[in-house]
């Protein structure tokens, strides 16, 4: 069974009239004798005269009897020829205001398809006349303005692909009828395109430019199959009839947040990009061989994008805004959108705030677009990229917020004078961490707005770990004990270089091994003391009085003997000897000749630098105590190789 062709909403083709006859078109094809042709051959003058006489003799009750006297004609053809062309009561003159008003009322009552029923209420008019009068003159959706270059480009591209299928081309131009498009092409565009090269250079842009016709459509028209229970808000024109109400919305800026449900095209999406609009037009193409493939793709897109569209709707109670341009694509369902740099941050974890989409009246849709999958079309790659970026960004904010906003005692630090850190502090005041907003109202910090972490719903961060930050505790304790610290000038770097040279030279000396071998029992005591307090010994080694005054030129190490004389300390019996209280022999092991100068003369150390480098700050001492307690928890044991 052949499918019935779909027509444009502005099409002038009559759906109920299968045979179109023309008035006195006697120059057409003539039927061959000897055969009964039932095709759409043109009527001759002789056939028209004979039909008039037969109607005068037999009347208009039985058209089969009349058709029996006309070879090659059926009863339907005879009836249509009489009613549409030859009937003397047929009015072919101009339309009056009363007739136009009557047509408008009947269209609102019966809809823009039942033209035969409408014609019965207008004496002397047939359905074809009423249909053409409505679409060409009375329909408020039909544009009567001049043709734009954009519309010409759409017609040119569509005509290259579809040919003279004006009803299909009319679907790409809302507000233009197929008859108007055909007349514009034949009278103006074809000559300009073929002779003057009009639109030839811009043809490379392709058909996606035709999709702008949907975005610039200034009207919406709808016909509800079932009358609603109450009046719908936002209708520009109230229905005059009760059987088939008609709603007209004049301009898109006057449309409220919720569009009335009985609309002709239910596109149940937040935002339709241009490629999606082009896919809608290709979907309605009967001759498109890839139509079924695209339908399946659209159904898959529905499943993958339904949750994302819900997630893009911003929460109405969200007061915190952030300066992130990457989130500007978030679209609010009620057409309320903030400007520029302050796009609302969508909550990805709560979907119960999302507004459900209005129900779809499938009766208003074409037969192939009744399913919701064909009504929701989005750009797949953009949606998937946005979902991935939003999830990664939310995870990053979760880690940053949990690190900066938590501490062991939840104390409020004085950030006007921050403690000494390894990172230089800016000269002006700024918020280093995100302030708490649990029990106090939100305060706008204009000067620190760029540096603040964006606010996020606490419900997302409930499962995040809340580990105390020892470094923040150390800074707070240091401020309480010593007061706010100030930035000190940088310590000269040559002292550090000298220390590194001395340490390198001392590490290369092998005389210490021989001295340790001669020292005997005191070595075990020194090793034990170094194990118990390594930080204190290191501090005493670098910061003791041996580095000051007259002892600066004293060499601490002696030249080493050969490596063959060095015993193995791990296997030697020296570890088993009792500890001696004598200290003198141990210091002798570090004596070196005095004729060997240092790399450079040492200078007096800065107290602050000495504290930081020798482990005397509060946080370093605290870490040392923790390490000592940790090591003391394990019993001592003999090292076995």
From Swiss-Prot:
Give the keywords, sorted: Activator, DNA-binding, Nucleus, Proto-oncogene, Repeat, Transcription, Transcription regulation
Q: Name one Pfam family in it.
A: Cmyb_C
Region Disordered, annotated ranges: 317-338
Just give the chief location class: nucleus
Q: Name one GO cellular component term.
A: nucleoplasm
Residue span, HTH myb-type domain: 35-86, 87-142, 143-193
Q: Does the keyword DNA-binding apply?
A: yes
Region called Transcriptional activation domain, residue ranges: 275-327
Q: Which SUPFAM superfamilies match?
A: Homeodomain-like
What would be an example GO MF term here? Answer: RNA polymerase II cis-regulatory region sequence-specific DNA binding
In this chain, the stretch annotated as Negative regulatory domain covers 328-465
- InterPro entries reported for this sequence: C-myb_C, Homeodomain-like_sf, Myb_dom, MYB_TF, SANT/Myb, Tscrpt_reg_Wos2-domain
Keyword Cell wall biogenesis/degradation in annotation: no
Q: Where in the cell is it found?
A: Nucleus
Q: Residues annotated as region Leucine-zipper?
A: 376-397
Highest taxon in the source lineage:
Eukaryota
What GO biological process, any one, is recorded here? Answer: mitotic cell cycle
- PANTHER family per UniProt: MYB PROTEIN-RELATED, MYB-LIKE DNA-BINDING PROTEIN BAS1
Role noted for this protein: Transcriptional activator; DNA-binding protein that specifically recognize the sequence 5'-YAAC[GT]G-3'. Plays an important role in the control of proliferation and differentiation of hematopoietic progenitor cells.
Comment on protein domains: Comprised of 3 domains; an N-terminal DNA-binding domain, a centrally located transcriptional activation domain and a C-terminal domain involved in transcriptional repression.
Q: What is the official name of this protein in its record?
A: Transcriptional activator Myb
- State the encoding gene: MYB
């Amino acid at each position: 069974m052949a499918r019935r062709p779909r027509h444009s909403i502005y099409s002038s083709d009559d759906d109920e009239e299968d045979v179109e006859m023309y008035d006195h078109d006697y120059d057409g094809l003539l039927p061959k004798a000897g055969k009964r042709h039932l095709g759409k051959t043109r009527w001759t003058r002789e056939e028209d005269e004979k039909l008039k006489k037969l109607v005068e003799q037999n009347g208009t009750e039985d058209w089969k009897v009349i058709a029996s006297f006309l070879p090659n004609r059926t009863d339907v053809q005879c009836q249509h020829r009489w009613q549409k062309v030859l009937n003397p009561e047929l009015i072919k003159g101009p339309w009056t205001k009363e007739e136009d008003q009557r047509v408008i009322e009947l269209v609102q009552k019966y809809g823009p398809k039942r033209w035969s029923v409408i014609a019965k209420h207008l004496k002397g008019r047939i359905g074809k006349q009423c249909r053409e009068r409505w679409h060409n003159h009375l329909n408020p959706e039909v544009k009567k303005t001049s043709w734009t270059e954009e519309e010409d480009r759409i017609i040119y591209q569509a005509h290259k692909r579809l040919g003279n299928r004006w009803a299909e081309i009319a679907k790409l131009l809302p507000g233009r009828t197929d008859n108007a498009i055909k007349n514009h092409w034949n009278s103006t565009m074809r000559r300009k395109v073929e002779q003057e090269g009009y639109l030839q250079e811009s043809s490379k842009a392709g058909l996606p430019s035709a999709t702008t016709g949907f975005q610039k459509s200034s009207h919406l028209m709808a016909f509800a199959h079932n009358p609603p229970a109450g009046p719908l808000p936002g209708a520009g024109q109230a229905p005059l009839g009760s059987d088939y109400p008609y709603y007209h919305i004049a301009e898109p800026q006057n449309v409220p947040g919720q569009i009335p449900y009985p609309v002709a095209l239910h596109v149940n999406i937040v935002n339709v990009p241009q490629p999606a609009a082009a896919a809608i037009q290709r979907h309605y193409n009967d001759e498109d061989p890839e139509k079924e493939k695209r339908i399946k793709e659209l159904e898959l897109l529905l499943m993958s994008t339904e949750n994302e569209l819900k997630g893009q709707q911003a929460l109405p109670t969200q007061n915190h805004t952030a300066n992130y341009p990457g989130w500007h694509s978030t679209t609010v369902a009620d057409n309320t959108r903030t400007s520029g740099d302050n796009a609302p941050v969508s909550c990805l974890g709560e979907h119960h705030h999302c507004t459900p989409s209005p129900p779809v009246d499938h009766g208003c849709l074409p037969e192939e677009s009744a399913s919701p999958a064909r009504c929701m079309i989005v750009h797949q790659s953009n949606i998937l990229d946005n979902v991935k970026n939003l999830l990664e960004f939310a995870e990053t904010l979760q880690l940053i917020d949990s690190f900066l906003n938590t501490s062991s005692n939840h104390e409020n630090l004085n950030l006007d004078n921050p403690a000494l850190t390894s990172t230089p502090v800016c000269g002006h005041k700024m918020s280093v961490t995100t302030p708490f907003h649990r029990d106090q109202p939100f305060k706008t910090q204009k000067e620190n707005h760029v540096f603040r972490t964006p606010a996020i719903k606490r419900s997302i961060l409930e499962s995040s770990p809340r580990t105390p930050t020892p470094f923040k505790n150390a800074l707070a304790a240091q401020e309480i004990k010593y007061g706010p610290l100030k930035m000190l000038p940088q310590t000269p770097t040559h002292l550090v270089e000298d220390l590194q040279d001395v340490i390198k030279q001392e590490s290369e000396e092998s005389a210490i091994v021989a001295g340790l071998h001669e020292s005997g029992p005191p070595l075990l005591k020194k090793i034990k003391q170094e194990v118990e307090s390594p930080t204190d010994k290191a501090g005493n080694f670098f910061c003791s009085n041996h580095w000051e005054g007259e002892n600066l030129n004293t060499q601490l190490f002696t030249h080493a003997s050969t490596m063959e004389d060095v015993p193995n300390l791990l296997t030697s019996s020296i570890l088993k000897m009792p500890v001696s209280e004598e200290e003198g022999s141990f210091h002798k092991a570090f004596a070196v000749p005095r004729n060997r100068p240092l790399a450079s003369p040492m200078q007096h150390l800065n107290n602050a630098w000495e504290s930081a480098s020798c482990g005397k700050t509060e946080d370093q001492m605290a870490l040392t105590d923790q390490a000592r307690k940790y090591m003391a928890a394990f019993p001592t044991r003999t090292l076995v190789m």
